[in-house]
């Protein structure tokens, strides 16, 4: 334990927090190109085929990104926008695709939480 004098001379070193999405480099989103689009299976209690893509970002990082929503139009060489946010049951997936921007289409026939999936408002039926 330091003495008062030692604290006056040196002070306490503040702890630096480690980023949960280092590839974004403090940016809200990053652009990248899909190098591989595939499905993968989640961790133990869950079972599904989750859609993911390996993306090479403009800053040189290569990351795995989750494609949310039902159905997508992505393939190799698609230009996409990546945001932070991990997928709890997919190890190594720390980023999400932004739907409805660049080459990524929004989710079709989406009625609720549309802004999260890049879906336009449906025309009102008369």
UniProtKB/Swiss-Prot annotation:
Residues 113-126 have a biased composition (Basic residues). It comes from Burkholderia pseudomallei (strain K96243). The gene is rpsL. With S4 and S5 plays an important role in translational accuracy. Interacts with and stabilizes bases of the 16S rRNA that are involved in tRNA selection in the A site and with the mRNA backbone. Located at the interface of the 30S and 50S subunits, it traverses the body of the 30S subunit contacting proteins on the other side and probably holding the rRNA structure together. The combined cluster of proteins S8, S12 and S17 appears to hold together the shoulder and platform of the 30S subunit. One of its GO terms (biological process) is translation. The keyword Nucleotide-binding does not apply. Part of the 30S ribosomal subunit. Contacts proteins S8 and S17. May interact with IF1 in the 30S initiation complex. One of its GO terms (molecular function) is rRNA binding. It holds the Pfam family Ribosom_S12_S23. Keywords: Methylation, Ribonucleoprotein, Ribosomal protein, RNA-binding, rRNA-binding, tRNA-binding. InterPro entries: NA-bd_OB-fold, Ribosomal_uS12, Ribosomal_uS12_bac. GO terms for cellular component: small ribosomal subunit. Residues 1-26, 101-126 are annotated as: Disordered. The modification 3-methylthioaspartic acid is found at residue 89. This is Small ribosomal subunit protein uS12. Belongs to the universal ribosomal protein uS12 family.
């Amino acid at each position: 334990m330091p003495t008062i004098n030692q604290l006056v001379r040196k002070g306490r070193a503040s702890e630096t927090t480690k980023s949960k999405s280092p590839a974004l480099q403090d940016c809200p989103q990053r652009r990248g190109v899909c190098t591989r689009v595939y499905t993968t299976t989640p961790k133990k209690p869950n079972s599904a085929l989750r859609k993911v893509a390996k993306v090479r970002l403009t800053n040189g990082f290569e990351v795995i990104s989750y494609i949310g929503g039902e159905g997508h139009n992505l393939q190799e060489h698609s230009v996409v926008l990546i945001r932070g946010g991990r997928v709890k049951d997919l190890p190594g997936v720390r980023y999400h695709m932004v739907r409805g921007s660049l080459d990524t289409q929004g989710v079709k026939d989406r009625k609720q939480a549309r802004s999260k999936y890049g879906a336009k408002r449906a025309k009102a039926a008369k």
